């Protein structure tokens, strides 16, 4: 059975639901491959029943883990990198093949990556979300990470991706 989780991004520090991971970070500057700390963002990763938020989230998803199907959120990460996107419907089958056969396995072999996982939204937008639990978010600017994002297949698939968002979260607060 695939793992299901609730994922939310806030512009304020949220309540700390029991059992959920809460991270502080920000959007990602793609030119410098660093986190934009101002304005700060908070991420909650909840594998239990989501707790209603006191204030609305900027983004909210209910997700079903696609690959690997049942791996829980690691507890020992030093950071989380989140990428979300939509894909052109006519390329969705190839997109899923690429992500499952090349991208996620490649990232799971990179030194410093604790877990690379991908999800499909049952609620929320964009439809696809990838979470990378890492030893440090500095990995995002390393030659290994950048090379993994420059394969011929990823360059082809990038043309069919839409609504991409990138976030980094460096500080776990719960």
Language-model region placement:
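Macromolecular interaction modules
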Residues: 1-174
């Amino acid at each position: 059975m695939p793992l299901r989780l609730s994922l939310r991004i806030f512009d304020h520090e949220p309540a700390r639901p029991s059992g959920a991971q809460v991270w502080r970070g920000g959007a990602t500057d793609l030119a410098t491959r660093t986190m934009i700390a101002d304005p700060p963002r908070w991420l909650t990763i909840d594998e239990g029943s989501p707790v209603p938020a006191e204030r609305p989230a900027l983004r909210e998803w209910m997700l079903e883990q696609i690959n690997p199907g049942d791996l829980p959120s690691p507890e020992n990460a030093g950071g989380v990198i989140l990428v979300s996107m939509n894909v052109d419907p006519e390329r969705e089958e190839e997109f899923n093949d690429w992500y499952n056969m090349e991208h996620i396995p490649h990232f799971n072999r990179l030194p410093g990556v604790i877990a690379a996982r991908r999800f499909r939204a049952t609620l929320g937008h964009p439809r696809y979300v990838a979470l990378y639990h890492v030893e440090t978010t500095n990995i995002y600017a390393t030659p290994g990470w950048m090379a993994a994002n420059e394969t011929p297949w990823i360059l082809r698939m990038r043309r069919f991706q839409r609504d991409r968002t990138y976030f980094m979260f460096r500080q776990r607060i719960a």
